[in-house]
Structures are given as C-alpha cells and as structure tokens.
Amino acid sequence: MASVQAYAQWVTVHLINSMSSETLSIQNASLSWGKWYKDGDKDAEITSEDVQQKTAPPGGSVNVNSCGRSDASSGTTGGFDLYDGNTKIGRVHWDCPWGSKTNDFDVGERNKNYWVEIGTWNKYGGAIGTVDVEVGRKR
C-alpha cells in the first residue's frame, strides 16, 4: 500500500488542443521530484519517454499525471515543453512540494503566435489537482 502522504501531492495536466489541424506534442519531460503515472493509477509508474509519446489531436485532449513517491516525504516538481510540430509553444511547470503550504503552476517561455489558457488549480496546500491547459494558434 502506498504512502498517503506522498500520493496526496499530485497534479494532472489536462492538455486541450483547440487548434483545427495541428497536433500537440510533448518534449523534454522531466521531474526533479516525484514520478509520472498512468491515468487514474498512481501505482502504475511510467517514464519520461512514455510521457513524451503522448499527443493531443486537433480538437482533442490528453492527460499528463505526476505525484510524489510512496514512502517518501516528497511531492512532485517538474515540467515539459509543448510543441506544434517543430515549434515550441511553451513550457508547463509545477511545484507541489510535500510539507509546504503553497503550490506553483505556470506555462512559461510562451510563443507569441499561440494563446495558452490555464484553468483553476489549488495554490494552497495538498494537491495542485487537475489543471486545464488549453492551447490555440493566434490568427
């Protein structure tokens, strides 16, 4: 059975692709703390390479999940780059530390030719939760 403490620190990035013909892809997925996991199962760890295989088709979506490790007093800190083909859209980054009162979530290094909308997320204590990150191309 996994540690409730570590698994209480989690984030699900729900990527929503609002582009009409381009597919969103993920590159440079990395974690300083925690682990990646399959949708709905914190015990089913996946690799950064598995995360980088995920895509969101035009008009579709995909989830990227991370949490703290069981039996460790650590949360999750990490991120990944969002791409449209060879064009970087921005870098999704979060910090959901164990034992801290504040969380952080942002999409930085944004490309001016795209819009990115970040949904609500839990800033204070516990899990960041599920965060919608919707991406589109400016006209």
Curated annotation (Swiss-Prot):
rRNA processing as UniProt keyword: no
Residues that make up the propeptide removed upon maturation: 1-5
An annotated Gene Ontology molecular function: low-density lipoprotein particle binding
Alphabetic keyword roster: Cytolysis, Hemolysis
InterPro entries linked to this entry: Aegerolysin-typ
Chain residue ranges for the region called Disordered: 47-79
GO process annotations (BP): symbiont-mediated hemolysis of host erythrocyte
Domain of life per record: Eukaryota
Biased composition regions of type Polar residues, renumbered to the chain: 62-75
Family in the record: Belongs to the aegerolysin family.
Name of this protein: Asp-hemolysin
Organism: Aspergillus fumigatus (strain ATCC MYA-4609 / CBS 101355 / FGSC A1100 / Af293) (Neosartorya fumigata)
